Every structure is written in structure tokens, then in C-alpha cells.
């Protein structure tokens, strides 16, 4: 409603009231007010009276109170309507601006003001003749302070002030916005409340009932609102001026539901009496009271203690009635609240002024409410005739009972509470100016809205609660009452009001409707009792709807949201709904629905997606429980929602803002649940509401309540002196009749309204707002509720929530104590009570704890959902007195609020808060808030993150906090005086169910006690042991939950822990168990999550925070802010825990539990490494095979809890994969990588040093420079990995494989930098590999000699890995984590590698371009020569290559892949490959064969080397990308260079079928074949380049079949079944690679001399590879490639690692073979255009101009070799990628491969093109029989043909597309190549998709097919050709292609198919 800004200014300064936005323009409000008043009774304003004050030394002797009046909801509605209609939009808008109203807060007796007759509550109209309208509070203060000795004030006497008479509801707002209120001094209300005309219905459709003005403004005419938002004048209230017992116009329900089961909640500010005939009502009241309490209480206390007292009396009087199951909310005379027929709230009678109606109910008999329920309405006001009371406070109290349980001052207090966030309100005003303007009244409106619909539909109980709350708490107070239900509802309404506001408010109403808000929100219930549910829904909802809207907007406290919810034009006022439920006394199922409703509302709150949505569901839920009405409610809620919701939301937000700054924030949060959390105040509500979406119904209510609670607590702090009164007032709200649903799921409807919550949260100033219900009354209600709760203890979570007032704020400690029996959840003193109120929510809370925060607080003891309350606290800034209890609550909330971020956290926080709040309520709120049981400076460190994760000391630093224990809340302040608003992390920690013990293991500090609550675990260091024990004792005393054994448990725990302390002084790790035990206890008691300690809502801080914390672990936290900052990090690092205190994972090495042998080594590392060494040295793929994620996570959690219990013999420690993954995970999660962040760049740079020795020395120096823990751990780990690598023969984990696994994990930066991951991956691999290989040297003082050797190997590795890694990275990217090899540590590796194209990428792209160019040239050449002699030695080649070295193996794999691909491509390719193989391998192969296939053969050979290059590239994703990019070209090239395709195929075949022979052949034929090979390489390179762009992998496969193929093949083999092959073994040995590489290269060199040169280089490389292989398979594999390319070496290193794994090798080999074949086919197609470009590029990169086949290639031979090496490396990466992709498939393929590489080739070929394979086969034959020189000649012939044929081939391919047949493949060398290319490509294209689809199936085939698809797809014609040929060949090869991608085993089928083709 109105934000109360209470400024405790000195007499003079008291004037500092910001009346900042008293928009005169909100005079449209005049209409609403006027209508309302006129309808009820014309206001006759005597006019302002002028008081002249003389300044004295003491000033003027008065202080001012600043209320921001937000535009009434109706005004907002009008404004919306007008805006929609184009009418007075501007005026409306202005009207909607929040208006500053300044009231006399205090008049010093004997002071000038006192003598002049200035009275408390007088509203300042003019200062020295200047109107305050439009002036900000500060401006008015300035005017006063700047006045001369004489100050002339024009004041509107409080009793005559419309705003005050109206109780700051709708009408108050309207009046505030009307000129009458300020200027015209219209006829003042006659002193009698009854005579007080209802304020003009600014926009209050519910104007008919005057009470709506303040308490019930929105709901007063909900029908009007829903019917016509402007129906303010609609006499919804039968007697607008009377008690507003008016039946809601729309459907005066024939049956007073409330009567039948009325929980009459008389919401008196002082006495929020709720006659709760049923538990429902009681629950409502208590919940409501809780919420209402803080905001109203503060206000009440501020403005009228006596009033509170009278109210208190009333409350007590009514309290008994509360227990009465009367359906009537007796409208008792001014001090008392009675149940009225309408039921819970007098609301039934008063739509216009719920509060008044309620208060009237209190004051009058049940029927009386109709007469004077609303102060807003003349009735209410007249019912409470200020003249009848001796003291203004009495009058206010009584009037509050009648009007809305709020006097102007009360409202001002609540406004001030909101006003405290005046800025926030203003802020929100922009967002929801209308809302703000109305927030005060809207708060109520809102409550009714939510309440109406919700109460009605889902849970009558909640409705009643909401209604009561709505009605009673006009702004804050009403909010308090309705707040519980409205609270969540309101916040939802607020922010989601547009969408879900109504539903939410309805929910609030549902929970709190029956409860008269202290503001008289009961009125909102007004005639609800008289209405049928449907009628209520319609009429009440309509009127309340508007009212609710108004209330929601004006008094966010009001749970008017339901009416809003009932967006159908019925504005089921939340009260009406609640009233109905109140009246109806919801049956148990209905009660349950109420809870559900609340829950839904909570969800709605938490779900920004739409209040309307939630509202609807809420309503629906209610309808489920409430029968039809709920359904109706839902409709109205949704329908009106649109109408009111939209209008409402802003006003509601403002309302809430007025009520609470927090609420205002909350409003935003409503719109965005996150926002809820964002705002310190609002977040508690919003966060609670927003975050626990699952419990939306209950949570929503809870949230709202929470905020009010926070506010209230704040207010309490502010009004500690007034605490009792506040509590009393709050008690009114607490009196919310919250009937527990039979299901026991009491919705937290009684939660305070958001406005109330906002007021409370804003509280610094708005403490008063919360004080509307006397604590006594509230306590009585609470007691009853508690009794009910106890009775239904089985459902304490729901019931306690419903029963426990969210913000009980017991004014009198005695009452609180009385209620103490009531479970803490029931008797949460101001804040605690709130939490218990929330107790009802816990079930929902678990879903969305934040929403339930408040309810959780109530419920907390049972369910422990304090997070909601905590949220409000943390998010809400309250006055200090409010803070006292609520700050705890708030602090808890802050902590909880953080928790709120996660349901788990919220849940825990809520529980904690709940306990705390329970305790607070139990002790008195005054005790809690005004009195700190203990306070002092303590060093504080959270042990558990918000997410429930344990945090290491390093994660969260110690901070010195001023700790104040109030009641059950422990508040942490940065400094003594900061208590008003602890930071969000300093939210009060609820100690209700806490376990406190001395902490020994958590920290090294002394005198540290650990406080374990349901939602947090923290350490406090006292100055000395005595202080620590005193704290422990005090906390223990405060920790008992009211009705739970938690306190005893806590004491026992403390005693036990103290004993343990003595026993565990030296034991650091046992305590974690104790904390866990305590957690268990806590969990058991509070229902906290399991493992709260480790999973406590604190999540690990960021690493920086962690570092700070770890550094400061022993020192007290120096900066609380820092600590807070760390919380998010902690949350992020949830899983990074220290084993002992904070877990093992995610904590710094120095924080990890040390190993027993070496304190610098983490225990986990020691254990895992030892276990692996004990059991896993012979375990194949150890560290590469990932463990079960669930098992790993489970073990991580256990280890994080503490490593003391580690039982290595446990079965869970039996899984070596899990253990190895655990180790990798540990290093991966290190906040500071093993190679520290600051050294990372140095390591990378050192690794890149060209001088091997220098590199090693630099690395060694850097290693020795590492921190001790890092150095020792690295040393230990390196030794371990070295040990593992030493067993690589069995475990297949060579240093390279281990490096691949651990490199990215160990060598990394804390921040995930994809660029680094990509560009540095080779370096990471190499560094780790180097460490493994030279561990002894690195970790010894001297080792220069060894570094040299190491350097050589390293250099080899380097040159190879870089390109390989780039490609590997690419492949990894493609493959993702599929390769088991890379899986664990490689998870990051693969992830990183995905993007690690950085440096390698550039290189690779160059290679691709060059390769493409080469490939193009090669294809051109090949096309004529492309036919290769089929060679049966393909398998041999594969075997040989695989056997050779790792490098060769990789090459073989590539070749094999190429061969497979060739086979897949078709027989032609196979023939070509065979020819190549023959040529390369078997010089003796008939030249005829070569000649026949010569054209293809030579080209194939040439393409083959390019293919190797390409293959090297192809492994990289870039290859695929290139393929995609160039696919059109490449397809063309492929078409044109079918021979090249064949060449790649032949290369593949060579590598596959005759790797050994090929190697030998290459060696033998190195001379002339080398020339050919040079040419062939050039072609292949061209093709490869082209392919690499299009399908570099394929080309590379073909070319690299011989060169890179071995490596790739090795990789493929290692991945595939090839792993079983001799090759893989040989590769492991390192032998095959050399031979393979050499033979490979020579095979290609047969094509050209340049190729020879290239082959020579390759051979050299091979030799190096051999050496390396001998030294290390990886090294060897790389060795052969090393000389050619360092970067490639690096890539190769990683490739080798993969390669080393037999499976990976096999797979990569197969995959590469496939890729090669496909790539060749594609390359040939692409070659024409791309090949040239790529050749050129590649020339620039590694090869000369391939376009000049002979000379250029010979020149290029080296570059080509390098390029090819790079390609090979790429192929290798590809192979690794293949391995990744098809480990399993490769295995299957491996079988096939083992059976015969040829089969694979055939299969691959079949996939690509049976024809191609046939051609390849011919090539093989020719190669075998023919000489390579003949191939060279053929190549030369083909070259010219190729250039010509590039075009002709394209055409030919087009033709071939049609022809595509096996015969095509075998056609003339030129023709066949072309044909082959088309058909092969067609097949390849087709196959490629298949292969791509089946990438996992066969690495090589996958690569090939993938490359090919890339190529084939872009060029449609080639694709078509491919498609046709594929169709033709596909028939033969498609099955193979399809299956083959899955398996190479399909090779037989494809082979068979190929044979037919042949």
C-alpha cells in the first residue's frame, strides 16, 4: 500500500520525510476516493487546521513520518483502463505516481508542537503556506527546518485525515492522490469512523466499501474491480461506511462460508484477532499475523503503542473467538475483533476496507462489520471513532481494527517500512508507478486478490488466511495478515501481478483471506462469508479483485492477489475468496488445497513466467480443494489477471514497495524471480517466492510472508522499544486464521503481504507497518494455531506454516512465551514466527524453498524452511528493532536467500530459518528483536556453501563479524551498528534447530565453535574458550525449536561435541563426521537436506575467493564483503570440497587432506595413484577409460565430507576406472591447476622452445618453481604416470596416451579458455608426456644429459603433435568425449581440443589449402592415372604399417582408412590403391596392371600422399569444415580427379592391404616410385589440400595411407580391433611405425621424385619415429613424422597417445582408411578448383607448387612431406578422432581389419563406391605388377588430363552420375578415374552421409564418409553423381557404407558388393 517511511528525526529533523512523489495528478484518485467516500458517505473535510509552532532550542518538538502513498489499485486500473481507452492516461499516470504523505510522527510533550496542538498522526498539508503536495519528504523537511522561528503548518488532523481514516488502503491511496486529501481539506471525516466517507474511488472499483480505502481498498469492491476496474464506486460493500461487512456485490455468497467454518480474524493493529473456528483460520491468522506483524507492528509501535494495546485487547478478545469455529468474524468494538459472519475477516462485510471491515468485525459483532468494518469506509472509521479513544494510538489501534487495522501512522509506519525503501519504491515506481502509488492499498488489494481467488479456489483455509491478512494488514499490517498468503501472492501479484498476481494474491488470500489484516484487511473478507464460493469468487473476487488490485498495489501486505487472480471481471477479492474459505471453513481437503494453493502461489511467485499462470494453477489447485469456486477463481484470476493483473502488477509492486522496499524489489523479483533474490529486501519474498517455484503455492505465500517477516524484524529493530506493541500489532497479523488444511498442508497464506513484507523489509523505516496486530492477539491466534498444529502435528510442515504466523512479532514477550509452547513454527517471534508460519510450506518448500521462506520460517522448526524468511531478511532491509528478530531472520534469509538460489539451499535455509524464527517467536519477538541474548565480535567463516557444499577455509575467509543472537536468530554484522541491514550473506542464522559444537577439524584456529543449522554450517571463533563456551551455551539455549526436541538435541550435540572437542583436539577429520551427524540430527529435526553440512547452501567461492579464504583460513575474516563475494564462488565450486573441513575436490592443493606419506600430496592423489599402481598397471586403458559418473560423483561427495573414513577395501574403491576418473577429476577441479595459472603461460612457452634441451631445462626450472604442494604433487603424479606408462604394453597407456588424458587436466588455467584448450592442447600433451618420459630427470637436481635425449624425442613429438593435435583437437571436437581414451581427463581435453585449432588451426588451414591445391593438382594428374592396380597386399600394407611404428601405425591406420575408404569408394579405388600398393610395395607388380590402372594408380598414389597430408588435416574438424566449405569444389575436384580419389583409396588400400609390403615396396621402390610418389604426393597433396578443405581427411587418408596412414591407421587400429593386430602391438613397440612410414612414403614417392624426396623425408621421419617409437610408441609414431613436421609431431604426440591404445589405433586406422578413400574420392572431385588453390596454399605452407607435378612436387616433396606430415598428423588427430568416434566400431571394424585390411578397404570402398574400390583394386594390381615409374608416367599423363579432365571429369562425373557403375570404375584409366570418381564419389557422397551417420561405427570409414559427405553434399552434381553411382555402387556399397560406418566388419559385404562391381 503505502510505504511508510519512518524517520526518527529529532523534533526538527523529524521533518525529514521524503514526500517525494506526492503526485497531485494522482487526483484521479479523487474519483476513487471520492466515489468510495461518496458512495459510503460523503467526506466532509473540516479542512486542514493550521498550527503555528515556535522554534525552540529543541526545535519544533515534533518529528515527521513519511509515508509514500502509492496510487490505489483502482487508480492504476483506471490509468491502465484510460491508457487502454486513451482516456486521462496522463492524469492517471500522474496519479499513479507514488505520493509522499507526511505525518506527524511524534509530538514532544511540552514542546512547541505539543503546545500548538499538533498531534501525532496529523498529516502535513502545508508548511509555511507551501503545500507539501509534490514535494519530497526531504523538501518538506527542508521547508520546516528552514523556517524561521515560527513554523506554520497546515495539518489534517489524523482523525480527520482521509488517508489515515482510510487506513492507507485503496482509499487512503486514492485520497492521498486526491487534492482533497491535501489541499481541499475536504470535509474531514467526522470524528467518527463511521462518518468517515469512503475515500473517493480513485480507481477502486471496490469503492463501494469504504474500508477498501485502506485495509480493503482493493478488495472492497473486488467485484467492481473485476467487473470494472473503476467500479470503485460500486457499492460492493453493502454498507460502505459500515464495517464494510458489505457482501461483495457480485456474488454475495448465499452461504457465509466463513460463517460455517469461519475463522474470524479480527485484524486489529493491536489485536489482530482472528476468530478461527477452524484450524484453517487460526493458521491463517498466525501466518498472516506473522507477516503482518513486522511491517504493521513497526508502524503500530511507532504511532500508537496504546493503540496497539487496545488492539491487543481486541486481539485477545478476538483471539478467543479466533479459536471459536464461528464462521463470523465478530465485528467487535474498537478494541476487539470478533468473528464476522463473513467469517475469518470482517471482510465479508467490508470489501471496501478489508482492514476496516476486519477491524469492524473485531470491534463489532459479526454483523457489525458491515456497519463499520473498514476505516476506509465511514463505517469502519466511524466504528472506530477516534473521539472514542483517549489516545490517538488507541484510536488508531481501534480504527486499525476497523479501518484496516491500521492508522495513518500505522500505515505510515508500514509505509515507512516500505518508505525505507522509498528509493526502492520510487525505483519500482518507474517500473510499476501505478503499483507503487497504490502499493499501500494495493498491498491489501493484492492480498485480497491472491487471497480471493486462491482462498476461494484452492484452499479456503489459505483464502481465509489470506483474507484475514489481506483485510487486516492494511498496508504492512494487512500485508502481515494477508501477507502470508498474500505475501507470496503479493509478491507474485506485485511482479507477476500482471500475469500471476491474482493467482498469487489469491493464494495469499487463500491462506490469509480469512484473517483480518491488522489493517482491517479482514474487511476484505468482508462479505465473503456471506457469499457462496462462487459468489465470493465473482462478487467478492470482482470487488476484492479491484480492491485486491488496489490492495495489492497499495498494500502489498494485503493478500489481495487472489482477487487479481480472479481476473475474470469478478475480482474475487482474495479476501472474498479467503472469506469464502473462511466462511466455508475449508474442509481438510480444501485446507490441503489451500496449502496447495499457497504452494502454487509460491510457485507463481517463484515463476516469473507469470503470476497469471501460477495464479491460475493456484486457483485451480484451490478449486481442487475448494471445489468449484476455485475453478471460478482461477478463471477470474486469470481473466481479471489480465485486466487487474497488468494494472495491478505495477501498482502492486509499488504497493509492495511501499509496504516494503524489499517488496518493491520483490515486485521486480516477481516479474523476475531472480529479482526477488536480487533485492535485499524483496528478495526474501521474491527470492523465496521466485526460487521455490515448485512450491509456488505455498512458497509464494511464504515468500510474501517472509518479506514481511524481514520487514517486521527490521521494524522490530527499529521499534525495539515498541517491540511489544509491534508484536501485538503483528500479532494481529499473526492472528491470521490459518486453518491447517486437513492434509496438514497449510498454505503459508498468512504470510504477510508483499507490501507489508516490503514495508517490513524496507523496514529500516517501515517497522511500524508491520505492527498491526498485537502480539497478544497474534500470539493467541498463534497459540491456537499451534494447538491446532500440535493437534495436527503430523502435518506440521503444512500446518505449522499455516498456523504459524509468518511474522508473529509478538509485541509482548509474555505472549510470545505463551505461544512458546506452540512449535517454533507457530510462534515465530516476529521473524521466527514467520518462519514457523512457513512451516506449513515445507512440503512445497522442498520444491521451492525460497518461496516458502516465510512459511518455512513458521514451518521451520518442523520442516526447516527458513530460507524464505532468510531471504526476506537478507533481501530486506529492516529497521534495527525489526532487525533484531528479523535481522536474524533476514540474515538467515540472506544466507538462506543464497540458498534460495538452489532449492536445496533454500530448503536448508528455510529449515534453518524456521528453527531460528520459531525460537524467536518462542522467546518474544521483543526479546528476539529488541533484546540480543548475546552479542559480540566473532570471527566467522561459513563451512557450508549455499548449495550445501562444504567450503574449504581457503574458499571462504574468516571474517570478523559482530554477532548478535536474538531469539533464535544469529545476526552477523560487519560492525556493531550495522545491525539494521546485514549483508545478504549475513542474514540471520537460525539457531533453532542448530547443532553447535566446538570445531576442531574444520579449522586450525582455536576457540572455534561450529554452528550447524539446517541450511548452513559455519564456524565462529571466539576470543577465548570461555567466550566460545558462552556463545555455545547461549546459542544452545536459543536453538531449541519451540515444540521440538531440537534444542535438547542441540544441547546434547553440543555437550557431545564439547566432549569430542577434548577427544578430537588433535583429530581434524573426525569432526566432519560429527558435523554430518549433527546435520543428520538437524535434518531429522528440521527436515533439512541430507548431508546439509557438505551440501549446505553455501557453495564454493570463486577460486580467488577460495584462495583468499584458504590463505586467511587461520586468520579471522577481515572483510565480510569478501566473504560474501566468495559465496557465489563457493556455490559454483559446490563440488570442490576439502576432504576434512571443506572437502577434497575443488579445493586448493594445500587445502586438500594431505597424504600420510607426504603432507604436500593430497590424500586423494596418494590413494588413487596407489590403488591404480596396485591394481591397474595392467588394466588396459587405465586413466583413459572413464569411470561411472555416478560412482565418481558419489565418491567425490564422500571424499568431500571427509577422507578419514576412506576404506580402500570398499567395493566402491574397486573400480579402477572410477578411481582413475576420480584422480583426474580431482586435478580437473583444482581451483589452482597443478601447473599453476601464473606458470601456465611459461610452461606453454617453454614447451614451444625449439631447442629440446633448452625446452626441457626450462620446463624443469618451471616445475621446480611450482609451489611446494604443486611440485610435490606433480612429482608424485609424474612418477605414478611413469609407472603406468612403463606398463604400457599391458595397459596400452603410453606416455602419450597418458599425456592426452592428463595434459589438459594438469596443464591448464583455472578459467576455461577454449582458445587455450585448442591452441595449447599439443603443448599440454607434450608437457605431460615429457614429464612422464623424463620424470627422473625433471625431478632431480641434475639431468641435462637426459633432457637431450628427451629433447629429441620431445622434438619429434612436438613436430608431430602440433598439427596432429590440431587435427586431433578438431577430431576431438567432432568426436566430443566419445573416445574413451580422452574421456576423463580428456573430457576437458576433448572439450578443449574441440576448439584447439588456435595455432594448429592456422597451420592446419594452410595445410588444408595447400593440400587442397595439391589434391587438385594430384587429382588432375591422377585422373588419367587414377586407376590403381588392385593389390592383395593392402592388408599386408595395413599390417606392416600398423606394425611399423606408432607413427607408421598411425599412417597405417590412415592408410588403412584410406584403403578402407578406397574399398568403400569402390573396387576401382581399390584397384587404384592396389596399383599404388603394387607400385609402391611391389615394384614387381605388372606394369600392365600399373598401366591399366596406371593413370589411376599414379594419380591415386599422388593423391595418396596429398591424401596423407589431407588426412593429417582431415583429422581436424577444420578438414571437415574445409570439406564442407569446399565440398562443391572438392566434389568437382573429386570428379575430375577420380584417380586422385582412387589414389587416396589406393593409398588407403596400400596402407591397409599391404602396409608391410607397401612399406617394403616403398622402401624398395623409393627411387623411381619416389618420384612418382612425389608426383603422387603432389597430386595427393593437392587432393588432400582440396580434400582437407572439402574432405582433407579423405585425401589425407589416401595420401597418408602410405605416409600418414600408418599413424592414422595405427590410431585407428588402436581404437579398432586393429589394436589386437600385430600392428598395434608393433606400434606399441614402436617398430612398425618406421617401416610403415617409410614404406608408406616410398609407396607414394613411386609417383614422383619429389615424392621420393618426400618419401625420403618421410623415411627420415619414420626413422625418427622408429627411434621415438622404440623409446616411446608415441615418440616413434611421431618420430617418423617428427622430422617432417614438428607441429605434426605435436599432433602426432597426442595422436600417438591415442594411437598407443590399440583400440584407438585400430579405430583410427580404420576410420582413416575410410576417410582416406572417401577423401580421395572427394578430393578428386574437388581437386580441380580447390586443389589448385589448396595446392598453392599448401605450397606456401609445406609443399612447393604441386601444380607443377614433377618439378614442383619434387621441390614440394619436402614441403609436401611436411604438409603431408601435417596432413598425417591431421590424419592422426583424425584417427584419434576416429578412435574417439568409433572405438567400439573400430573394434568391430578391427575384427574385419584383422580379417583383412582389404575387407575394410572394400567395405570403405563399398561405402564410398564399389566402383571406386574396384578401380582401386585394379590400381593395386597394377601397382603391384606395375612399376611406380610407369605410374609416374601415367601420373604425368593424367596430370594434363587432370587439368583437362577437371572439367571433363566434372562433365564426366555428371555423365558418370547417370552411368555410375562398377564398370565405370574400371573404365579407361582416365575415363575410369573420372567414372570412378563420380561413382566413387557418388558412393562416397552417399556413403559419406552414411559414414557420417555411422561415424562411431568406423573411424576411417566415418572420416572418409564424413569428409566425403562434406565434399559430396556441397556439389550437388557430384552428389548426384555420387548419389547415382552410389545408387549403383551404393547398392553394393551402401549396405557396406551404412554398416561399415558402424562397422568395418561390413567389409565382407561391401567387399562382396565391390567384387560384383569389379
Swiss-Prot record:
Residues 1147-1339 form the Rho-GAP domain. Residues 931-1040 form the PH domain. The modification Phosphotyrosine is found at residue 882. Residues 448-458, 1383-1401, 1544-1559 have a biased composition (Low complexity). Residues 286-295, 306-325, 418-436, 659-687, 1349-1362, 1603-1612, 1671-1686, 1874-1909, 1918-1931 have a biased composition (Polar residues). PROSITE patterns: PDZ (PS50106), PH_DOMAIN (PS50003), RHOGAP (PS50238). GO terms for cellular component: actin cytoskeleton; anchoring junction; cell junction; cytoplasmic vesicle membrane; cytosol; Golgi apparatus; Golgi membrane; plasma membrane. Transmembrane segments: none annotated. Residues 930-1097 are annotated as: Interaction with ARF1 and ARF6. Gene3D superfamilies: 1.20.5.220, 2.30.42.10, Pleckstrin-homology domain (PH domain)/Phosphotyrosine-binding domain (PTB), Rho GTPase activation protein. Keywords: Cell junction, Cytoplasm, Cytoplasmic vesicle, Cytoskeleton, Golgi apparatus, GTPase activation, Isopeptide bond, Membrane, Methylation, Phosphoprotein, Ubl conjugation. Residues 1-42, 286-325, 418-458, 659-751, 859-885, 1086-1133, 1348-1401, 1418-1575, 1598-1642, 1655-1686, 1860-1958 are annotated as: Disordered. There is a cross-link at residue 1444 (Glycyl lysine isopeptide (Lys-Gly) (interchain with G-Cter in SUMO)). The modification Omega-N-methylarginine is found at residues 554, 575. Induction: Up-regulated upon cell differentiation. The modification Phosphoserine is found at residues 36, 57, 459, 612, 616, 625, 717, 857, 862, 881, 924, 926, 954, 1099, 1115, 1418, 1432-1433, 1504, 1527, 1669, 1742, 1917. Depletion of ARHGAP21 induces cell spreading and accumulation of F-actin stress fibers. Interacts with GTP-bound ARF1 and ARF6. Interacts with CTNNA1. This is Rho GTPase-activating protein 21. It comes from Homo sapiens (Human). The gene is ARHGAP21.
